[in-house]
Amino acid sequence: MLDFLAITLSGKPPQVIQGETVNLKWQWLGEGILTLVPHRSYTQSVVISAGIHGNETAPIEILNQLVTDLLAGQLPLSVRLLVLLGNPPAIRKGKRYLSNDINRMFGGRYQHYTPSDETRRASTLEQRVMAFFQASHTSERLHYDLHTAIRGSYHPRFGLLPYQQTPYSAAMFRWLRDIELDALVMHTSAGGTFAHFSSERCQAASCTLELGKALPFGENQLSQFSAITQGLRSLVSDSALPARKTENMKYYRVVKSLLRQHPDFKLRVAEDTVNFTRFAQGTLLTEQPNDNYRVEHPYEWILFPNPHVALGLRAGMMLVKMCESELPIT
């Protein structure tokens, strides 16, 4: 039986690149790229990606187990499915990326970088996702991009909705609620993420899922992500999810991107600051020539603080809380 992760890590294609089981047909489309199509009829085309950052191993392990169970017939398949391991060379080396962050390159932004394996990979992933969605006229398109964060978080499991000018899918929102996310963040401007690409270019209902903190293979406590794992299994098998057992999600929207625009940029937060740390109005957060930032709202929460990004890139985001009723859903 095909071992998706092991073959991807080997750097060599499988000897057999397509086959079928009692429930499905599968095809290897390239390194870390696999389609699975059920014999039965389906109404959804679903993309699940992991490993866009090579050191984010928990989502890779979760996705690989999902593929293993589908191919073994232990889990029925009810959707047309594309699974992707985003950056295999970085996964092999246990690094976030080798040259540049692929998750800043989508939507054609890779063309603005020095050509590398990672710019070529971003292009390949775009082409494969567009071709996958264009090849079927299913009524619903979904994309979940699985990640873990560099640092800890007051909300260990959270989602990020890409900016879009149309309302978000109500079905996707219900699924996100039922997989017991702690928080949901709404972007308010376009970006170079994989989820933004599939939303904007493919009209997919897309979301980036953050599952705890990045750890090496074998050190993840996957039990803390059991609701998300069950959610993915429910999604691909079209089975019901149990009702949410934890407290309601918290909702945030982005109000400021903290850009590092000068070599003397300083991010005035402690090195051990965790995601969703709160700061009061007037707090000085960034300093650089001609552009300091102080908290403008009564309270703002910081997400992804990282003062070491390259010039021109985002060193963090500032959020404000919002009500569920403020989220545009159709």
Swiss-Prot record:
Cofactor(s) needed for function: Zn(2+)
UniProt cross-references to SUPFAM superfamilies, sorted A to Z: Zn-dependent exopeptidases (SSF53187)
Organism name: Yersinia pestis
Cofactor note: Binds 1 zinc ion per subunit.
Active site positions, chain numbering: E210
UniProt cross-references to NCBIfam families, sorted A to Z: arg_catab_astE (TIGR03242), PRK05324.1 (NF003706)
Bilayer-crossing regions: none
Recorded GO MF terms: hydrolase activity, acting on carbon-nitrogen (but not peptide) bonds, in linear amides; hydrolase activity, acting on ester bonds; succinylglutamate desuccinylase activity; zinc ion binding
Pfam family, one: AstE_AspA_cat
Family classification: Belongs to the AspA/AstE family. Succinylglutamate desuccinylase subfamily.
EC number in record: 3.5.1.96
Statement: the UniProt record of this protein carries the keyword Metal-binding: yes
Protein purpose: Transforms N(2)-succinylglutamate into succinate and glutamate.
Keywords: Arginine metabolism, Hydrolase, Metal-binding, Zinc
Pathway per the UniProt entry: Amino-acid degradation; L-arginine degradation via AST pathway; L-glutamate and succinate from L-arginine: step 5/5
Top EC class for this record: hydrolase
Gene Ontology process terms (BP): arginine catabolic process to glutamate; arginine catabolic process to succinate
Official protein name in the record: Succinylglutamate desuccinylase
Gene3D superfamilies in UniProt: Zn peptidases
Reactions listed under catalytic activity: N-succinyl-L-glutamate + H2O = L-glutamate + succinate
Chain sites annotated for binding Zn(2+): H53, E56, H147
